[in-house]
Structures are given as structure tokens and as C-alpha cells.
Amino acid sequence: SLLTGAWMPYNLLSGAPNGDGKWRIAQMPTADGSETNSENGGSSLVIVKSDDKAKVAAAYKFMEYACHDAEGIKTRVDGGAFPADNDTLKSNDFLNMTSLTDSDGKAHEYFGGQKFNEELAKAAANVSTGYKFLPFEVYARGKFGDYAGDAYTGKTTLSDAVASWQKDLQDYAKQQGYQVK
């Protein structure tokens, strides 16, 4: 199992090719059984400050193409990006995909023929607006593997690992001057 963002399918294809056909996409389980989840990731395109007006104009033109032009959006999505626009996210072409294309142009039913984008789009529609990242999110994510890894290798239970991770985060928060409730 892997709890991750919608950007992961193409990373799996390129990074774990032997998993081809063995993975499936599902909604993340929650304690109360709801389908609510949180955002994990995203991407940004920026223009760095420059006195070269031609370069700035070209960069802006590219950003417009990549983010607002249907062809540019399709190019990014075909390359593995998750769509940031609702038209693509709701399109039948996107929702009905069952295969990923590798860098050699070969199609792979990495998720066993599943319409994987249907699940990813459903998850995107159910992102909670009340979720907030920790002010020390990078620390928290970095420490998670330290504790979850012990559960994965059988040195402890997942429940105990999560409890230890929580205590670590509470201690760290207090050390950094945050009030822990």
C-alpha cells in the first residue's frame, strides 16, 4: 500500500516497472468511513526576476500555454501531471484512461485495466477545505518514515508507531514554541 498524491502513477511506472499490472487505486481509508481526504502536493510554475523583458515575456507565454491552453494542459497531463483544470479533470478522455505511456511510447495497464483517474478525480473532489498543514510539515513527514518503517519491518505495531510519531511531533512542537492542544 502507498498513501500518496495523484501525481504518483507515472512515477510508479518509471520507478517500479516490475509492478506493472499489480497496483490499484482506491480512496484513502478514514477513521469514520467518510471519503474526505487532504491535499498532498501540487506544482508551481514561476518566472524569476529578470531585466530581460523578452525572456520574461517568453516565460509568461509558456505559462499561459501550460496552464490555460487546452493543448498545453493536455501536453502536461500526457506527460504525467495531474490536471489542475476542471474541464480536463471531468473529461471522458481523462476519466476513462486505463493505461500509462512510458518514455518509449509503450502503453502499460499498470493498474490492471482499472479506470484509475476516476478514483483520483473522486479523491480530488473530496479534499477537505478544513485541513491545514503543520507549520513544521517537512519535519513531520521526515520523521514518519522513522516510525512507520519499524512497523513495516515488524519491530512494532503500526498503532504503537503512530503513537510514538505523535509524541515526537508534540515534543518537537513544544520545543519550537507551539502550543499543543
Language-model segments: which ranges?
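A generic secondary-structure signal for well-formed alpha-helical elements
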Residues: 6, 16, 69-70, 169, ...
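Conserved C-terminal helix/tail region of periplasmic/extracytoplasmic solute-binding proteins
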Residues: 106, 118-181
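Extracytoplasmic/periplasmic substrate-binding proteins
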Residues: 1-61
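Homeobox/homeodomain signature
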Residues: 15, 35-37, 106, 110, ...
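Mature extracytoplasmic/periplasmic domains
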Residues: 10-14, 43-138, 179-180
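Acidic, low-complexity intrinsically disordered regions
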Residues: 3, 19-21, 106-107, 112-115, ...
